[in-house]
């Protein structure tokens, strides 16, 4: 018996274990898990049936003058405000689909932060709600703000980027509500679009005009073609 105990003690010393009665076992150290990656995608395709079902009666009314065949459904990778990679959705006119895929690919590669890219239908087609959520969007069959004329958004030819930090500004009103602090463009703050901003430069390089240079109103979120 003494011989067995001596052997056990020797083994304990060799492996460095703690042989005290009641002592807890050492924790098992597992390999560190690899982070889960989000797929990188930049695609444009005709409007799928599932997306059409989401749009009808919301962003796409029954009396819309533009055909669904003239629109494209885009899936776009982007980096959100937390630095996390996401995949968003846009619907746009087929005439600018390639431009937008190229622009958003460049923004992604530069890790340009965008808070959200979701279809306006996720907000019931409500532009104010989408802007208040700082959501980047494109197609929405609606009229220009305060006017009878159709917006370029109704044709899928306009994109609003990070709208809360880049609001629509009139002398008497700022949209979205609550974004007045971002109306003064002489101030520096994160996510501001100006002529030195990468987003501005990319859209201009692809032939888009910017609402930030309009005279009667300024729409700093807005790019159209």
Where are these regions (language model features)?
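N-terminal Sec signal peptide cleavage junction
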Residues: 17-19
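Catalytic cores and adjacent binding grooves of peptidoglycan-active enzymes
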Residues: 36, 143-150, 155-225
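Active-site-adjacent loop/helix surface patches within enzyme catalytic domains
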Residues: 118-155, 166-168
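N-terminal module-boundary/linker segments of secreted carbohydrate-active enzymes
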Residues: 25-84
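Hydrophobic core
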Residues: 13-14
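Structured segments of extracytoplasmic/periplasmic soluble domains
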Residues: 79, 99-113, 142, 164-167, ...
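Active-site acidic/histidine clusters and adjacent loop/turn architecture
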Residues: 66-131
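Sec-dependent signal peptide recognition
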Residues: 2-10
């Amino acid at each position: 018996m003494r011989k067995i105990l001596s052997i056990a003690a020797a083994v304990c010393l060799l492996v460095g274990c703690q042989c005290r009665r009641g002592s807890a076992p050492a924790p098992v150290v597992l390999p560190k898990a690899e982070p889960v990656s989000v797929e990188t995608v930049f695609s444009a395709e005709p409007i799928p049936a599932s997306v059409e079902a989401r749009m009808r009666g919301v962003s796409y009314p029954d009396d819309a003058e533009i055909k669904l065949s003239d629109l494209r459904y885009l899936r776009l990778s982007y980096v959100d405000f937390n630095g996390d990679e996401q995949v968003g959705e846009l619907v746009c006119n087929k005439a600018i689909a390639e431009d937008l895929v190229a622009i958003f690919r460049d923004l992604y590669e530069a890790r340009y932060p965008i808070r959200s890219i979701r279809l306006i239908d996720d907000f019931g087609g409500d532009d104010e709600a989408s802007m208040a959520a700082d959501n980047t969007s494109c197609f929405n069959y609606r009229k220009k703000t305060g006017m009878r004329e159709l917006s370029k958004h109704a044709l899928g030819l306009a994109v609003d980027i990070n709208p809360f930090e880049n609001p629509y500004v009139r002398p008497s009103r700022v949209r979205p509500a609550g974004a007045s602090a971002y109306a003064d463009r002489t101030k520096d703050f994160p996510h501001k679009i100006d002529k030195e901003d990468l987003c501005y430069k990319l859209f201009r390089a692809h032939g888009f005009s910017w609402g930030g240079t309009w005279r009667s109103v300024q729409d700093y979120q807005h790019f159209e073609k």
